[in-house]
């Protein structure tokens, strides 16, 4: 086919594929969401960016889920010391209002094409997106995501020491994965129906946590308490 899938952080595999000279573009999610909160390392990302540059391949960062402050920086790739050619954005850009965008490096010369766009530049969507940026700045939500993410991850790792069902805690900012030695459904159903706490999931054993960027310490503590109650009952 025309698409090749390669393992995250296996730089040698990516370099081998890129050095064939027929790769148009590379798309990576710097923190994989549905992929299980797997994180690209700086060494991998920088090596990949260099390989793309060497081979004339476009580097695309998918920031739809991990961008817009979610990781504790505005974009997740900023943790990795790279500058992609294209950045895809959605979800957080409109805080629930349907909108998406594509950020393009100034290295690409803009030209007029034949096609237009049906919903592009929608005034209501753009107004919502501008309001989101205002609130993020006024309420320091990116910094709050970093601080509260650090706190939540630390508390979850502390909980791991007394809860053998937790096998791993990983993530950055408010994009966190908690892995169990039991199916995530065993934990998630109790959280939803008994503790009234909604979470995401990935794979078969991972609880995926993406709380609002405005989460408070009290709310984080409340979640830890509810999760502890559920785990104690397993």
What residue spans do the PLM features occupy?
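Conserved N-terminal phosphate-binding loop of PLP-dependent enzymes in the Aspartate aminotransferase
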Residues: 1-234
């Amino acid at each position: 086919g025309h698409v090749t899938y390669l393992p995250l952080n296996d730089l040698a595999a990516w370099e081998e594929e890129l050095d064939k000279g027929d790769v148009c573009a590379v798309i990576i999610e710097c923190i994989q969401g549905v992929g299980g909160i797997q994180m690209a390392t700086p060494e991998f990302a920088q090596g990949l960016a260099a390989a793309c540059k060497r081979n004339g391949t476009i580097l695309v960062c998918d920031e739809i889920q991990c961008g817009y402050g979610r990781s504790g920086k505005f974009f997740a790739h900023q943790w990795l010391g790279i500058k992609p050619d294209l950045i895809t954005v959605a979800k957080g850009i409109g805080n629930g209002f349907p909108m998406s965008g594509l950020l393009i490096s100034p290295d690409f010369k803009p030209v007029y094409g034949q096609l237009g766009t049906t919903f592009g530049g929608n005034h209501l969507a753009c107004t919502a997106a501008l309001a989101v940026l205002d609130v993020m700045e006024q309420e320091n939500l990116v910094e709050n995501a970093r601080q509260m993410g650090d706190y939540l991850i630390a508390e979850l790792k502390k909980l791991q020491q007394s809860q053998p069902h937790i096998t791993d805690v990983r993530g950055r900012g408010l994009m966190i994965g908690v892995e169990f030695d039991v199916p995530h459904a065993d934990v998630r159903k109790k959280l939803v129906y008994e503790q009234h706490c909604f979470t995401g999931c990935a794979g078969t054993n991972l609880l995926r946590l993406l709380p609002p960027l405005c989460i408070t310490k009290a709310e984080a503590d409340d979640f830890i308490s509810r999760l502890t109650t559920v785990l104690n009952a397993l």
